[in-house]
Amino acid sequence: MSEVLPADSGVGTLAVFMASSGSTDIANRNSPATPPNTLNLRSSHNELLNAEIKHSDAKNSTPPKCRKKYALTNIQAAMGLSDPAVQPLLGNGSANIKLVKNGENQLRKAAEQGQQDPNKNLSPAAVINLTSEKLEVKDPHPQESSGCEILPSQPRRTKSFLNYYADLETSARELGQNLGPCQGVGEEKAQPGPGQAPVVIGNGDLLPQKPNKPQSSPEDGQVATVSSSPETKKDHPKTGAKTDCALHRIQNLAPSDEESSWTTLSQDSASPSSPDETDIWSDHSFQTDPDLPPGWKRVNDIAGTYYWHIPTGTTQWERPVSIPADLHGSRKGSLSSVTPSPTPENEKQPWSDFAVLNGGKINSDIWKDLHAATVNPDPSLKEFEGATLRYASLKLRNAPHGDDDDSCSINSDPEAKCFAVRSLGWVEMAEEDLAPGKSSVAVNNCIRQLSYCKNDIRDTVGIWGEGKDMYLSLENDMLSLVDPMDRSVLHSQPIVNIRVWGVGRDNGRERDFAYVARDKDTRILKCHVFRCDTPAKAIATSLHEICSKIMAERKNAKALACSSLQERTNMSLDVPLQVDFPTPKTELVQKFRVQYLGMLPVDRPVGMDTLNSAIENLMTSSSKEDWPSVNMNVADATVTVISEKNEEEVLVECRVRFLSFMGVGKDVHTFAFIMDTGNQRFECHVFWCEPNAANVSEAVQAACMLRYQKCLVARPPSQKVRPPPPPADSVTRRVTTNVKRGVLSLIDTLKQKRPVTETP
């Protein structure tokens, strides 16, 4: 009968198989059971690979949910490739039997020592030799048990890892069927669950389990600080919290007393609780400092000395300051860090702070997020991670700046205002979206579109500073985006060119700020959105104040311009003592060389008979030699007669508006016009023209018609209505009618006499 021994393990059990005989092994391998084509991963494959190791004490078992690293398994034995140095141990001679017994004795001795000192670990060399013997030795003599045999699954060199795993699973199933009648414990305890298997000692006896203790879930376990190799640490800023979560899942669950007694199975790595564990901070470039806050390390490299926050991957030049536990919830992100600091509501706490702040427990939601980030890494973040590393490598080369210098350089102008922001990108807008009543809705939609989809920062297109922290400065009527590291200006926008600005209206969007302006290169309207560390209402208020100031300055400048213009006007209205009124240069003046017969007063202002009688009287009273030569200048408004000998002597000056009648006499060489001098006095001036008076008469006629047109245009519309007819004896009526009649008769006379004068 099989002897049932108690096992002092409350966490889990592990099945360890020993070879019964060579024939049994062959029969097991040739059994009709077909290996499965799929891998059943309900239990950790590392536990199944270690199923051939026999343990006499259940304290050496691991917790059911604590999975050991791949490095804890001898890879050559798992793949069926045994070490050549131990290949002679595979024989069936007596030497092999002796080695098996020696190995069993060593295991029992180790178990007794483990009971005395549960926290003592075996040396790696002894464990490696012991494991090699147990994995490679096969007992040729069968051992009888109480009605049931334990069939081993011996890996062969010619089989692959998958074949070996399939045989191992088949053996486990057959063992479960054979052990059914002889188990002395309950069925629910005998069946191995995920990560569990019944404990079997070397002679085939089954060890019962103690009542299961409450298993610690990942949510209830206390999280320790992340430790990894130096290579992992170098890559840590790139992967961020996901790498920490992966290492946390493998290594950093709170170790139990049973787990602390496990020894390593390989020389490549040590147990998580082993004193031989490789410390990441053993590297000379990483130095521990007890004065630093939890999760911070000091790093020395070619760039200088800086500080690295392990959980978030944040690096900074300044020494971090310890923050009390009650202030963790209100911590602000550091603007001097290379990577973007999260907002206070989304800020993650360091791993070492979870146990203190949460009472030794992890929130289930946080655990699920960490688990999802580890199992399903997001490949779309590779581009952003690459940009982050490039940005970090550039900024770490710069010398650190002091806080005093930063504040002085940013706030050099006392009226300048600076805000910590992070760009979320821009969205193109149409002109009609900025119409009154639509602009606020359009800007809020842009804030929604960019703020909701940028939670994970999927891309860096259109994002100033590749999504990093920066300063938004309002100074000298300019909105500037300044790099917090080297104080370089990433973008500048004149405030007067900003069309619209606004703040997010949705719940939780009070920190989102947006403004709309036209791009100076593409001339398209862009709505730029930023995430602020403080409520964005402060930026909007500052912009409003600056715009009000600009409008007031413009209003004052306009008032000054109007006052100066009025002063100039008042100065121009002062009447000078002497003024010259030049003749308009646009006035057309025609000059004719004629002879002036003289002037004769007449009784009537119009009439050809009056004109002809005046011409005959002047021609008969003087000879042609006595007629002086003069220049007649015919302009639009004036007819002037100037002496040819003395150009400054004006003989006659007649305004066209006072010319009452004109015409050509019976002789085509004679030309005369009647001028109204006022007080019912009229004068008739007579001229002798060569070769005829046609050109002179046409010039004077054109001047009269132009003057008439100007009078019609200058008259207001209300005065264009024909006035009532004047009295019959009115001089005005008679003068107007006679002028028209005289002009028409002159035209008829010229038409009749022109062919005669031109005949030779």
From Swiss-Prot:
This is Amyloid beta precursor protein binding family B member 2. Plays a role in the maintenance of lens transparency, and may also play a role in muscle cell strength. Involved in hippocampal neurite branching and neuromuscular junction formation, as a result plays a role in spatial memory functioning. Activates transcription of APP. PANTHER family: AMYLOID BETA A4 PRECURSOR PROTEIN-BINDING FAMILY B (PTHR14058), AMYLOID BETA PRECURSOR PROTEIN BINDING FAMILY B MEMBER 2 (PTHR14058:SF11). Residues 212-230, 261-275 have a biased composition (Polar residues). It holds the Pfam family WW. SUPFAM superfamilies: PH domain-like (SSF50729), WW domain (SSF51045). Its main location: endoplasmic reticulum. One of its GO terms (molecular function) is amyloid-beta binding. It comes from Mus musculus (Mouse). The keyword Endoplasmic reticulum applies. Residues 413-580, 586-738 form the PID domain. The modification Phosphoserine is found at S123, S160, S334, S409, S412. Keywords: Endoplasmic reticulum, Endosome, Golgi apparatus, Phosphoprotein, Repeat.
